[in-house]
Amino acid sequence: MSRRARLAAHSAVSTSLAMCSDDTLHDLVGAAVPLGSGIGGRSALLDVDGTPVFVKRVPLTDLERLPENVRSTANIFGLPDFCQYGVGEIGGPGHGAWRELAVHTMTTNWVLANEDQQFPLMHHWRVLPDTAQSLPEELADVERAVTYWGGGPEVRRRIEALEQASASLTLFLEYIPQNLHEWLGEEIKAGDEAANRACSWVERALHAGTSFMNARALLHFDAHFENILTDGRRLYFTDYGLALSSRFDLSPEHARFFERHQTYDRCYTVWYLVSWLVTAFCGYGREDREALVGECARGARPAELPAAAQAIVMRYAPLTVVISDFIRKLRHESRQTPYPLEEIRRIIASKPG
């Protein structure tokens, strides 16, 4: 879709939704076609005057609804900084709905100002009453989840508050039906020529997207391929439940965490791309995949991959090894595993790009 068409659809949909009362909007959302549910909330597809709209209902806890906390980007529950990571063996409790709204506002404004087009537009948002929902599977065993994420009372309070939430922050977003995982999977099935073209484009687009966000004080922190949408012409980074910005109301500790993780999005997307390519082309599980990437980091060529994918794996294998080790330790040994910034800097300095 062209920029002009996107903006025209956005104008029409946002105006239509803004005209709805809370009761009307609540009924519309209730009648929308359910798409799924997960740790970040529930989603549905809504038709607004012929335009499909993606609806995301993010649990809004009672604490977040207190007058002093409305629209606050502070760490209201006092969660430890390692809850920022989206790579735990058990899904994390998240840092709150208002941060997600703030990032959607930020990214939508970038699109409207024609600074960048790599984000879905937020047409509208509203706080709507909701019935308390069962916890997502990852958090359903509260004791296990609390223990995994450090055992602190702050984590317990956050998870229990999610379970008791009686409202949702309802986001009405531009609908882009295909994610990058699906699209790239189709491209590599179309033969080596299509695969080479797609892999090269995805590598460039991931770098462009993360660089743009990071240069504007935003770290996504969860940019895996199911959180990135595509129409085959550009990528659209979405799902900001773990996003972090220096423009948020951060404590000194979390401000330092933000500064230390300036390379995180770039490293995470590189790690994910390399891991995805080796899995897709070789059919390997984690252990075999990491063994192959380790061999590539020492100079071996992965002959099973077409040229573009092979070049990507070779280029980023050393960095992927470091990130794989970090994620393994974070998942299985300690949530307080330090981010390997110095090692990352050394690799980047020796092999730029």
Language-model regions, residue ranges each:
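Activation segment
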Residues: 60, 128, 178, 231, ...
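Conserved ATP-binding subdomain of kinase catalytic cores across diverse folds
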Residues: 30-171
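Amphipathic alpha-helical segments that form well-ordered structural scaffolds
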Residues: 97, 102-110, 179, 205-212, ...
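Catalytic-loop of the protein kinase fold
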Residues: 215-225, 230
